[in-house]
Curated annotation (Swiss-Prot):
Protein's UniProt keywords contain Transferase: yes
Listed Gene3D superfamilies: 3.30.230.10, GHMP kinase, C-terminal domain
GO cellular-component term (any): cytosol
Cellular compartments annotated: Cytoplasm
Species of the source: Halalkalibacterium halodurans (strain ATCC BAA-125 / DSM 18197 / FERM 7344 / JCM 9153 / C-125)
Binding locations of ATP: S73, G127, A128, G129, L130, S131, S132, S133
Lineage: Bacteria, Bacillati, Bacillota, Bacilli, Bacillales
Family from the record: Belongs to the GHMP kinase family. GalK subfamily.
Keyword Transferase set for record: yes
Descriptive protein name: Galactokinase
Amino acid sequence: MEVAYKEDLLTSFAEAFSIDRLTDVRVFFAPGRVNLIGEHTDYNGGYVFPGALTNGTYMVIKLRDDGEYHLRSANFDTSVVFRNSDLRFDPKDDWGNYPKGIIAELAKLGVDLPGATIYFYGNIPNGAGLSSSASIGMVTAYGLTQCSGIDIDRVTLAKLCQRMENDFIGVSTGLMDQFAVGMGKKDHALFLNTSSLEYDQVPLILKGYKLVITNSNKRRGLADSKYNERRRECEIGLEQLRKKQTNLSHLGEVTEEMFAELGPVIEDELIYRRVRHVVTEDARVLAAVSALKAGELQTFGELMKASHLSLREDYDVTGVELDTLFDLQASAPGCIGTRMTGAGFGGCTVSIVHEEEITAFQTVVSKGYEKKIGYKPTFYVTELGDGVNEWKGGA
């Protein structure tokens, strides 16, 4: 993943819009996110454990006074132009619908924006399950409100970004991605109860190990995937559990002990497996956080592996690419934990690998993956960073 520098971003902004004077121009950054454990639990009111990445989306912005928005991106060829008076979803605007949706949601809150000229640059791969959509949404929301002198707290902005994806884009995302992008902290993972929004910043002390993200290079189109189908299956499971316990509001309330008692009411085997994953994954998150706090990194790694197996066997969201990576990485040199991360159906895995074995790990996994799948994966040795902020820039 490339490193961005403020001077380069300002130059690109000036060239993209033929601007001679860079006055009143500001730069903001929102990270991508990687979820260490706790997958497909966020929309079920369960626990998640994500962290903000040091890679993400940069936004260079200059306010206008004509109610127009002129958008360009280093990552896409198309430019997007629209007005405050026309904030409708438009398929031809493609990626531009994400910032447009944010502006539309802010307008619903009564926020009167003057228009803006905006340039984006992202260094997280799109469709890889590292929350490029939450990243561009949060950087747009945070940057626009900061430039306009409007004080909206980060939790409210995260909820606004979730509404944008749900209502404007049409993807039923949970709140985890936006929350992690907004509330991330360097070298910490975010233990979040997605029902109450109570959270704890837990230090990620890797003691000679590194986080390695492996991109399967199979793009994962979230809106076109079976994400919404899984969400509906969980809703069906919850409805059936309520036959025995009527006061359940979400699956995140169901402990393993409760499921042992209530589970048999679910007669459909597929629905039963979907619910079982959510219940056991919540338990794994709690155990993983406890293991990290106790310095038990090996235990944390084993829980990561168990998470992937549940996502494969009970939730059916892995696929041949992610399963191939998992099988190779679980036995690769220096790897003590690995799992798919994100919604699945392609995208990435996250692994904990000893820093002295990273090259050997990558070699073994790359060769095995290419032999079976036909093309190579891409590796990113990464760390956890801060949430959305005004960016002061590199060199």
